[in-house]
Amino acid sequence: QRATGARVHLMRLSSAAGVALVRAARREGLPLTCDVAAHQIHLTDVDIGFFDSRFRLDPPLRGQRDRDAIVAGLADDTIDAICSDHRPVGDTGKLLPFAEAEAGASGLELLLSLTLKWAQRERVPLARALALVTSAPAAILRAATA
């Protein structure tokens, strides 16, 4: 990116390290945008329980520290958008031992409810929460085509 000046969009941030790298790149003035999947705002590796394959995702669920960093990144505008990460997997792909199960989950129908739940919990204004799933992704796409 430094050599070409190309815009970069990082999809589905899931770790504190990823949020920190975005902050560092922005301090350098690099043209960078990023998003996070709605489920990463709410779930952690603890939710996997005893290797529940329904929670086999890519990127994987991480620890509480990572989830807290993602929430902080949304609060301070480090993270530009919230996405659904909609990658449904049928029973044949999920009803397997955790290590063999396909990564993915149906996310489209949960995007709005999870975003609004986060906004209520964190006292985020409704307009801001809705922008993160509507106008912010649209702006990222427009910038990518400019």
Model regions and ranges:
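His/Asp/Glu-enriched, well-ordered alpha-helical/loop segment
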Residues: 2-5, 54, 81, 87-146
